[in-house]
């Protein structure tokens, strides 16, 4: 009998480091496209890019290590799925930083798993789990259904603005009126897909391209577009990394401000800086962000002028034209 153990690492694996262990056959699951691309050629483990891990991979794993995400609901969604497929001979461990929210694990999972704390070090905690009851996992029970302006919005746990449509997106949508003449749109960080779906209700002939680095967001966008009979090209991309078309009339985004709970303005700067490479001659970029974010610095660097189209108590919508590029 082979002594090689099949190990599956899943959950929030973006910053997880896997030391080389010859007697371990490791598979790592990620929802992050950048993480997937960076590790495709890693000889220490096979990388999987999907919303959830394939059933057979879970069932063939001797050990599962779940890295706790920042969203409690995302953890419940993924763990519910995993333990619904496990046998009692399989081992499952949970690892997370003190700041991730992992300390709620015993209350969150007590119906299905006996949780035991094994160790804590370097601001992280490690737990083991013994399954006492296998849940019946129903994917559709975790899809959040929202409705706004007759648009059906469907969102998977872990995707931005799961419970409702955020005010920034609403403000950005309010600047998009019927008198504008857009034929091609790039929606960066598409999330639930509500922004592109709204544009399709105003411009029925519009050609939509939706990108996100998170596969759960891409799946949410597919669900939203399908529910509203809207067509669009949806694919993973780390900002512009996977975008090949370079003639968009509009680049639109409600970009993330945090990476792993830390403020990070590099994404916004990248979107603004490189937008000119992907805009048509009459194209424009529109971005919504919090009022206190120094977005104007990037626009000043890369455009001769820009416009603040709209403001609210918390948000600003910025706009700049390709013709005004530096």
Swiss-Prot record:
EC number in record: 2.1.1.172
Subcellular location: Cytoplasm
SUPFAM superfamilies from the UniProt entry: S-adenosyl-L-methionine-dependent methyltransferases
Gene Ontology cellular-component terms listed: cytoplasm
An annotated Gene Ontology molecular function: 16S rRNA (guanine(1207)-N(2))-methyltransferase activity
Signal peptide range: none
Keyword Phosphoprotein included in the entry's annotation: no
Alphabetical UniProt keywords: Cytoplasm, Methyltransferase, rRNA processing, S-adenosyl-L-methionine, Transferase
Catalytic reaction equation(s): guanosine(1207) in 16S rRNA + S-adenosyl-L-methionine = N(2)-methylguanosine(1207) in 16S rRNA + S-adenosyl-L-homocysteine + H(+)
Annotated PANTHER family: RIBOSOMAL RNA SMALL SUBUNIT METHYLTRANSFERASE C (PTHR47816:SF4)
Function (record text): Specifically methylates the guanine in position 1207 of 16S rRNA in the 30S particle.
Family named by the database record: Belongs to the methyltransferase superfamily. RsmC family.
Subunit structure: Monomer.
UniProt protein name: Ribosomal RNA small subunit methyltransferase C
Organism encoding this protein: Buchnera aphidicola subsp. Baizongia pistaciae (strain Bp)
Gene (UniProt): rsmC
